[in-house]
A protein has these predicted regions:
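Active-site proximal loop and beta-alpha junction motif in alpha/beta enzyme cores
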Residues: 1-99, 109-166
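Helical hairpin unit composed of two closely spaced alpha helices linked by a short loop
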Residues: 103-105
Length: 166
């Protein structure tokens, strides 16, 4: 999955260049300790004692379009169970509540590890999937888990012709 970057200009987050680690940000008039990272797309991770779909949706509707995130942002709330297990709920930019996310899983794991709360190898539980994440010494993140068939689509000729133009 690559490496996580916590640098504000790589996420991106407005303001001076800095690593966004355990920084306070306000969403919906409530301050949260946040860690932001890019794992190819932007993520906001909030450590909490309790997590739920309702809570991530409440925060996500504000954080997704907050002015400090010029490219919008995916939001994860996480609960660390122990040094090798964490739970996360995900709110994806442009999609809303999401049952599972590979990049969200990696961002959550990278944030928890960077905060010193987990070992480099951990299990991440999401509502529709459990993944194993390993953060190697060089920072590379490896994601392992099951995949499942979701569905299929048929694309019309107009759409496939447009793809050829790209």
């Amino acid at each position: 999955m690559g490496k996580a970057s916590f640098w504000s200009d790589e996420v991106p987050v407005e303001g001076p260049r800095r690593e966004i680690i355990n920084e306070t940000m306000v969403f919906g008039h409530i301050p949260y300790p946040v860690t932001c990272s890019s794992v190819g797309n932007p993520h906001l991770v909030i450590l909490m004692d309790e997590i739920s779909k309702d809570l991530v949706c409440r925060i996500g509707k504000y954080s997704e379009t907050a002015k400090q995130f010029p490219e919008k942002i995916n939001t994860q709330i996480i609960k660390v169970l122990d040094r090798t297990h964490l739970q996360t709920e995900v709110y994806e930019r442009g999609a809303g509540y999401t049952l599972a996310s590979g990049s969200g899983c990696c961002a959550a794991a990278a944030a928890a590890y960077r905060l010193g709360l987990t070992d480099p190898k951990m299990i991440v539980q999401m509502p529709e999937g459990t993944m194993e994440v390993e953060i190697r010494e060089d920072g590379e993140i490896f994601l392992t888990g099951d995949v499942g068939y979701v569905g299929s689509i048929s694309l019309g000729s107009y759409f496939t012709e447009q793809l050829k133009l790209v």
